[in-house]
Amino acid sequence: LQDIINEFGGAMPQTFGVPVEEIVRGIKMGVRKVNIDTDCRMRMTGQFRRIAEQNKAEFDPRKFLKPAMDAMRDLCKARLEAFGTAGHASKIKVIPMDDMAKRYASGSLAPKTN
């Protein structure tokens, strides 16, 4: 992801995230919270830069946004499949906003330590 940004004019210093394989291993060992926002932002940024470089006369932001969103969607899909979470949306129980507001107001969602 970083290489694409830099290939098309970016100047990101070398960074290292957690490889997908290690995240998958962590999930198998009980990790339940995984963040992929940085990867999503980097994927979109790389696509914006690629399009700007390859189409220097383009100024319509819609021409940048659609392929960038498609690239981010593809990255999310690949991550969700790798993490074993694809296809589970129907198992999520919707909680109405009013119910969540009551939970927050009652303090039942406040962090607790033992």
From Swiss-Prot:
GO terms (BP aspect): glycolytic process; reductive pentose-phosphate cycle
Alphabetical list of SUPFAM superfamilies matching this protein: Aldolase
Pfam families: F_bP_aldolase (PF01116)
Swiss-Prot/TrEMBL catalytic activity: beta-D-fructose 1,6-bisphosphate = D-glyceraldehyde 3-phosphate + dihydroxyacetone phosphate
Record's keyword terms, sorted: Calvin cycle, Glycolysis, Lyase, Zinc
Quaternary context: Homodimer.
Protein name per its UniProtKB record: Fructose-bisphosphate aldolase 2
The organism of origin for this protein: Rhodobacter capsulatus
